[in-house]
UniProtKB/Swiss-Prot annotation:
Pfam family name, one: Glycos_transf_3
Function: Catalyzes the transfer of the phosphoribosyl group of 5-phosphorylribose-1-pyrophosphate (PRPP) to anthranilate to yield N-(5'-phosphoribosyl)-anthranilate (PRA).
Keywords tagged on the record: Amino-acid biosynthesis, Aromatic amino acid biosynthesis, Glycosyltransferase, Magnesium, Metal-binding, Transferase, Tryptophan biosynthesis
Residue positions binding Mg(2+) 1: S92, E230
Binding of 5-phospho-alpha-D-ribose 1-diphosphate, residues: 80, 83-84, 88, 90-93, 108-116, 120
Protein name: Anthranilate phosphoribosyltransferase
Catalytic activity: N-(5-phospho-beta-D-ribosyl)anthranilate + diphosphate = 5-phospho-alpha-D-ribose 1-diphosphate + anthranilate
Length: 351
């Protein structure tokens, strides 16, 4: 289908079939469409509203072109859409560190900041972690520690074709939705935070289509009326849970798990160095209660998604024990040491 027909279909407000979306995305990623055409397609898709079928089609196209890595399908990815503009510190990254120290295998897919002051790649780098290890080094790190960070540009090189267009457009597009879905390790267990409650249904359908084994899709609100793509410490957290094809929905509050309420301002972060300092304080036990509780709440959900915890309450106990025993700080320091050794090893091979 030529670009003109694709554009005409979107102008008429019609949805693409999965096959049409695969064709469209293949042409974009293979450089067969000009930047002007790509911009028009992305803007029209966004105006019409992206469907689960279109998202699944884009997923299949991008995963076909991705540099995939074989780790462990049962590893957990903690990844959010971003875009909530709440300015919280890197909670899901912190949770991945604590969960890993509790025995959860982590395959975290992430990138530098897009909508926030500090993305997962930025804060890990500030903590001393080499984010751009080659895949074979990342595999070694995972085998030794059960932790992997998958830096998106390394595994999705074709995405560089759309980066200038996305920057120039300056609006959310289908690519903002795709980020949490296109984990190059094909992780089948995911904790996904979304900035808009309407996206929960879309993610549910796409995760079911693409074979998620267990997933939690989370959207929350603060008492101040701010939307969050992570659990809330002072308002409702809406959850859609997927487990072997079965979908359940529920809403929880921090006090359901014995957590105190904290205002949004208490869990807001800043630039990469500030957020790295917050994570270090959480790990060494010197953090304020709000920072600690935000990390524990998300970690509890990651432990539950992994199957290590029977429920969120159980996950909270597991997370708290790992953190308060010093296990989390010790394990993360071990990860940093292995990461540095692998960075030196593979740099010397390249040189």
């Amino acid at each position: 289908m030529p670009q003109k027909k694709l554009l005409q279909k979107l102008l008429a407000g019609e949805d693409f079939s999965q096959e049409e979306m695969i064709l469209c995305m293949n042409n974009i990623m293979d450089g067969l469409f000009s930047e002007m055409v790509i911009a028009a397609l992305l803007a029209l898709l966004q105006k019409k509203g992206v469907t689960p079928t279109e998202t699944a089609g884009a997923y299949y196209s991008l995963m076909e072109k991705a540099v995939t890595i074989e780790l462990d399908e049962n590893a957990v990815d903690t990844c959010g859409t971003g875009g909530d503009h709440a300015g919280t510190f890197n909670i899901s990254t912190t949770a991945s560190i604590i969960a890993n120290s509790a025995g959860v295998r982590i395959a975290k897919h992430g990138n530098r900041s897009v909508t926030s002051s500090c993305g997962s790649a930025d804060v890990l780098e500030a903590l001393g972690f080499t984010i751009d290890l080659p895949p074979e080094a990342t595999k070694e790190l995972f085998q030794e520690s059960g932790f992997a960070f998958l830096f998106a540009p390394l595994y999705h090189p074709s995405m560089k074709r759309v980066a200038p267009v996305r920057r120039e457009l300056g609006i959310r597009t289908i690519f903002n939705i795709l980020g949490p879905l296109i984990n190059p390790a094909r992780a089948k267990r995911q904790l996904v935070g979304v900035f808009n409650r309407e996206l929960m249904e879309l993610y549910t359908e796409v995760l079911l289509q693409t074979g998620a084994r267990r997933a939690m899709i989370v959207h929350a609100m603060t008492a101040e009326g701010i939307a969050l793509d992570e659990p809330s410490l002072n308002g409702p957290t809406h959850i859609v849970e997927i487990h072997r094809g079965t979908v359940t929905e529920h809403t929880v509050y921090p006090e359901d798990f014995g957590l105190a309420r904290h205002s949004l301002s208490e869990i807001q972060g800043g630039e990469r160095d500030e957020n790295a300092r917050i994570i270090r304080q959480i790990l060494d036990g010197s953090a304020p209660a709000a920072h600690r509780d935000a990390a524990l709440f998300t970690t509890a959900m990651a432990c539950y998604v992994s199957g290590k915890a029977r429920c969120i309450d159980d996950g909270l106990d597991i997370a708290r024990e790992a953190l308060e025993s010093g296990k989390s700080e010790k394990k993360f320091n071990e990860i940093l040491k292995i990461n540095a050794e692998l960075s030196r090893k593979y740099r010397s091979v390249v040189n």
